[in-house]
From Swiss-Prot:
Family the UniProt entry places it in: Belongs to the radical SAM superfamily. Lipoyl synthase family.
GO molecular function: 4 iron, 4 sulfur cluster binding; lipoate synthase activity; metal ion binding
Pathway where it operates: Protein modification; protein lipoylation via endogenous pathway; protein N(6)-(lipoyl)lysine from octanoyl-[acyl-carrier-protein]: step 2/2
Source superkingdom: Eukaryota
Name of the coding gene: Las
Domain Radical SAM core: 119-338
Name the UniProt record assigns to this protein: Lipoyl synthase, mitochondrial
Disulfide bonds: none
Length: 376
């Protein structure tokens, strides 16, 4: 899903979605809403489509077996062209710093909202660690692959933490390529980055979207106990489709095991996963996947539309309607997820989700502080 530009090996691969509001009153309003415990949907309402616009859509939404022709993009997946002062500022800063942005290369549908500021002016960033080359080749992902990618940059943890500290962010997401060529899968490198970030700013919330480390529980424990706040690992699709969608080394049950063990190693963690829809899955299979994730103790789930990155990747089987995504949002809430983000343009590191999780973590800290106070 992510890929970086060539030629900047020494720099961390950074996707900045810094959208700082210039309106003090607006920021104060957001803080007040967080303090009162907002609903996640307060942050993810998409004004670009309404039921009246998609309900009467007569275009084809599903490819039949054997059909080669690609489906046309329905109206609810069409987004506005990125623009605005914040967008231009972010883009220029990245160029000046010679930092690579996977937002652009992956053609993320939310780039205009994130870089342009969005409705709430949230300040988040996503950083991709350990290079731009993955040892795996999932059929939905456009990251380049190799059996033995270049060695890790040993300065990356410090450089990344220093950059983050200077930005004054509230929430950071660390993601990475798979590095099966390394004995520990890069787990110590990721853990060191988290520790360096926390050493500079203990108040920043850190989410790690990590690989499965081949199911090595020692690596999972390293990440779970490194000081992060959110442990994320994506299941991607339903069990039946996993061998066709993900790399052969990725296993459905292994993903569930990683998520459940992360919670066992550190019960205070928030755990998170993501499902792509539109690959040919049935409603029953999605339902079972949601139940499996809840049984594994997963707290947060995101569901979004699969989008074919290039002609070489898996074709979209179906464009799922906003109504169906709303159904899965309701179902996730019924099953007891801490939050369910479900929508055509929702992605696993959707910034509004980060904003909402921040409020959850802040409330947890407040409760822990109150509970730790000695009785008078």
């Amino acid at each position: 899903m992510l890929r970086a530009l060539k030629g900047h090996v020494e720099s961390p691969l950074i996707v900045v979605t810094r959208a700082a509001s210039t309106n003090a009153e607006k920021l104060e309003e957001i803080r007040e809403r967080l303090a009162k415990g907002p609903n996640f949907q307060d942050f993810v309402q998409n004004p670009d489509y309404s039921k009246s616009e998609w309900e009467n859509y007569e275009g084809k939404l599903r490819r039949e077996k054997g059909e080669e022709q690609r489906l046309r993009l329905p109206p609810w997946l069409k987004t506005t062209i990125p623009m605005g002062k914040n967008y231009a500022k972010i883009k220029n800063q990245l160029r000046e710093l010679k930092l690579s942005t996977v937002c652009e290369e992956a053609r993320c549908p939310n780039i205009g909202e994130c870089w342009g500021g969005g409705e709430h002016g949230t300040q988040t960033a996503t950083i991709m660690l350990m290079g731009d080359t993955c040892t795996r080749g999932c059929r939905f992902c456009s990251v380049k692959t190799a059996r033995k990618p270049p060695p890790l940059d040993e300065n990356e943890p410090v450089n990344t933490a220093t950059a983050i500290a200077s930005w004054g962010l509230d929430y950071i997401v660390l993601t990475s390529v798979d590095r099966d060529d390394l004995p520990d899968g890069g787990s110590k490198h990721i853990a060191k980055t988290v520790k360096e970030i926390k050493a500079r700013n203990s108040n920043i919330f850190v989410e790690c979207l990590v690989p499965d480390f081949r199911g090595d529980l020692g690596c999972v424990e390293t990440i779970a106990n490194c000081g992060l706040d959110v442990y994320a690992h994506n299941i991607e699709t339903v069990e039946k489709l996993t061998p066709y969608v993900r790399d052969r080394r990725a296993h459905y049950r292994q993903t569930l095991k990683v998520l459940s063990e992360a919670k066992r190693f550190n019960p205070n963690l928030i755990t998170k996963s993501s499902i792509m829809l539109g690959l040919g899955e049935t409603d029953e299979e999605v339902e079972n996947t949601l139940k499996d994730l809840r049984e594994a103790g997963v707290d947060c789930i995101t569901l979004g539309q699969y989008m074919q990155p290039t002609n070489k990747h898996l074709k979209v089987i179906e464009y799922v309607t906003p109504e169906k995504f709303k159904h899965w949002e309701d179902r996730g809430n019924q099953l007891g997820f801490l939050y369910t983000a479900s929508g055509p343009l929702v992605r696993s590191s959707y910034k509004a989700g980060e904003f909402f999780i921040t409020s959850i973590l802040e409330n947890r800290k407040k409760r822990q502080a109150l509970n730790s106070k000695p009785e008078q």
